[in-house]
Amino acid sequence: MKIGIVTGIPGVGKTTVLSFADKILTEKGISHKIVNYGDYMLNTALKEGYVKSRDEIRKLQIEKQRELQALAARRIVEDLSLLGDEGIGLIDTHAVIRTPAGYLPGLPRHVIEVLSPKVIFLLEADPKIILERQKRDSSRARTDYSDTAVINEVIQFARYSAMASAVLVGASVKVVVNQEGDPSIAASEIINSLM
């Protein structure tokens, strides 16, 4: 099985790009599964009573976040292993999480070694476009990312973090630009890099 980790700042369009990737892989008849790392963490955090919503996860104490990361990684690999050798697993997550205590690596050693991806993708877009997308998405609380300078800083930390994680497992790192108006281009680039 080939695993690709698709990272990006909130509002870059990961969920949209991955929905296009799902459609393309289905049309090609390729066995695949797309999972959201945050969903796995959220389900555990809700069960344990740590949070009431997804956006509260990044505000938890660092130790709680690490515990949730490890549990999620193990569960994801269990689920993706059902795809068999020819399957493609795409994981929607973040390379870094901006917390009150500083930047938390989204793919630290205890996570990346379990997931062992072929490629870590950095989905990026112009910070002004990301800010516009965030404003249009009223379903999420992202006030801690509501400035282009902060968005630029997070993008840079994500690049550093992705490369550091890739070194641990021999994965490649690929920047994919999500152009406004056509997420299928980014989706195709991700798929082609895993084939």
Curated annotation (Swiss-Prot):
Q: Reaction catalysed by this chain?
A: AMP + ATP = 2 ADP
Give the domain of life.
Archaea
Q: Keywords on this record?
A: ATP-binding, Cytoplasm, Kinase, Nucleotide-binding, Transferase
State where the protein is found.
Cytoplasm
The record's section on Pfam families has: AAA_17
Q: InterPro entries under this entry?
A: Adenylate_kinase_AdkA, P-loop_NTPase
Q: What class of enzyme is it?
A: transferase
Chief location category: cytoplasm
Gene Ontology MF, one = ATP binding
Record's signal peptide: none
Q: Where does ATP bind?
A: 8-16
E.C. number(s) listed in UniProt: 2.7.4.3
CC terms in the record's Gene Ontology section = cytoplasm
Supply the NCBIfam families for this chain: PRK04040.1
Its subunit composition reads: Homotrimer.
Tell me the protein family, please: Belongs to the archaeal adenylate kinase family.
Instruction: Spell out the protein name for this chain.
Output: Adenylate kinase
Chain's gene name: adkA
